[in-house]
């Protein structure tokens, strides 16, 4: 499948830019707004795309949910968490963009993909699959509460950036980087009390 090329017009929803007042992805006050549990942002913006070449292997990481302001909002289909800014591919290893922000409950997380120039998020349909280099994934356990004296391992190396990861609440949470969330909320599902929030980079 070849990546779709840019067409005319951007995504627009009802009641504001994308279905809500003030929120980038449809809610009040937050970029991925809604009502309910806390969520957060991820790696922030990055300038340009560096061609790293296709990996030797790709695995499914997410399915398309909807487009918003040029980005693709996707639901994580992996048990592991992608690195911020990790390249995202089609099944044929054609790169279409990079991981931009991760948000939502830990057990049903979503992330947005910043599309490469010339590729349009609105050209994808719900359920379309996206892929990632398996070496760009981190174990979920790295973001859950750990007993004192224990640390989580797994591939991916130590976290890079200004933030840290620490569990909060019975379900655990992701807290990374510079300050609080941007004010939006995302409803948790499945009874999980954990969530992704904060800004930072792996």
Swiss-Prot record:
Pfam families: Gar1. Residues 1-37, 144-202 are annotated as: Disordered. The keyword RNA-binding applies. GO terms for molecular function: mRNA binding. Residues 6-48 are annotated as: RGG-box. Residues 173-190 have a biased composition (Low complexity). GO terms for cellular component: chloroplast thylakoid membrane; nucleolus; ribonucleoprotein complex. The keyword Protease does not apply. Disulfide bonds: none annotated. Keywords: Nucleus, Ribonucleoprotein, Ribosome biogenesis, RNA-binding, rRNA processing. GO terms for biological process: pseudouridine synthesis; rRNA processing. It is found in: Nucleus, Nucleolus. Residues 151-160 have a biased composition (Gly residues). Belongs to the GAR1 family. Component of the small nucleolar ribonucleoprotein particle containing H/ACA-type snoRNAs (H/ACA snoRNPs). Required for ribosome biogenesis. Part of a complex which catalyzes pseudouridylation of rRNA. This involves the isomerization of uridine such that the ribose is subsequently attached to C5, instead of the normal N1. Pseudouridine ('psi') residues may serve to stabilize the conformation of rRNAs. This is Putative H/ACA ribonucleoprotein complex subunit 1-like protein 1. It comes from Arabidopsis thaliana. The lineage of its organism: Eukaryota, Viridiplantae, Streptophyta, Embryophyta, Tracheophyta.
């Amino acid at each position: 499948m070849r990546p779709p090329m840019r067409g005319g017009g951007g995504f627009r929803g009802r009641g504001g830019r994308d279905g809500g007042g003030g929120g980038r992805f449809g809610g009040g006050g937050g970029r991925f707004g809604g009502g309910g549990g806390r969520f957060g942002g991820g790696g922030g913006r990055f300038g340009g795309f560096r061609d790293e070449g296709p990996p030797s292997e790709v695995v499914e990481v997410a399915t398309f949910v909807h487009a918003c302001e040029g980005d693709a909002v996707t639901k994580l289909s992996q048990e592991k968490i992608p690195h911020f800014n990790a390249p995202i591919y089609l099944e044929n290893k054609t790169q279409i963009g990079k991981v931009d922000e991760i948000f939502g409950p830990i057990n049903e997380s979503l992330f947005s993909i910043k599309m490469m120039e010339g590729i349009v998020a609105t050209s994808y349909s719900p359920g379309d699959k996206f892929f990632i280099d398996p070496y760009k994934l981190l174990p979920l356990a790295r973001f859950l509460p750990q007993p004192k004296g224990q640390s989580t391992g797994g591939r991916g190396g130590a976290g890079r950036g200004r933030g840290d990861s620490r569990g909060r609440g019975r379900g655990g949470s992701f807290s990374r980087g510079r300050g609080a969330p941007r004010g939006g909320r995302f409803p948790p599902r499945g009874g999980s009390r954990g969530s992704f929030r904060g800004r930072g980079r792996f």
